[in-house]
Amino acid sequence: GMYIGSVGTKGLNHLIYEIADNSVDEHLAGFCTQINVTLNDDGTATIKDNGRGIPTGINNKTGIPAVEMVFTMLHAGGKFGTGGYKISGGLHGVGASVVNALSEWLEVSICRDGKRYEQRYERGKTMYPLKEVGECGDSTGTTVTFLPDKQIFEETVYDYDILKQRLREMAFLTKGLKIILTDKREGMEREKTFHYEGGIREFVTYLNRSKEALYPEIIYCEGEKDGVAVEVAMQHNDSYTCLLYTSPSPRDPKTSR
């Protein structure tokens, strides 16, 4: 609960957000243009991106591959190292390892430097060393598939509508990134694509779509000072809604400081 909020549907969906947030970080760093989130018929979820691929080299301090550190050690995410991500949306390097620990099993497949690598974990434990399984050509990216642990979660059925709302927000907040949500569960098959070049300016248009705007043009500005980047879009309407996001996760305007 400390990391994902609950062991119900909210926490279950959060597992997907955490893996997807790592892909968003790749986009914010300029290396990922598409994320595919798939709800599989067997209860697993798959998150695939076309980023650089999680590093596979051996870490000098631990003696294990960087990808294994990401999935088995807290605070081992790429955003902590030198040259890490300038902006990040996840749990600051703990997200992937938490998802792994809360899953019956998790498999990661990486395309990097022309080669494909795979590794499997069960309840957080490494099943075999990272292995090279083939070639990728020019393709790069990371694919993660996991099965939430029924011994931990009270609910193991993903809520498509909640995921759709969050992934839509994620796409609005990371302009240019395409996110495709696919439901392959029997009797629930559907797909939705989110891709917004207008970013949060387009998000305001979406939020105001059924409201009466008090003026036609959206107020927009962006800037950076002392290493803090700020982007603002607003358009007053005849009701009251205040939404606040930081990097690019939602926050409660009443409690955020």
Where are these predicted regions, by residue range?
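Bergerat-fold GHKL ATPase/HATPase_c domain
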Residues: 1-17, 68-69
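Conserved small/polar residues in nucleotide/adenosyl-binding loops
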Residues: 245-250
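Conserved ATP-binding N-box helix of the HATPase_c
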Residues: 10-31
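GHKL-type ATPase core
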Residues: 43-61, 66, 77-206
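Conserved activation segment of eukaryotic-like protein kinases, specifically the C-terminal portion
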Residues: 72-76
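A conserved short beta-strand within the histidine kinase catalytic ATPase domain
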Residues: 33-38
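Short beta-strand elements
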Residues: 230-240
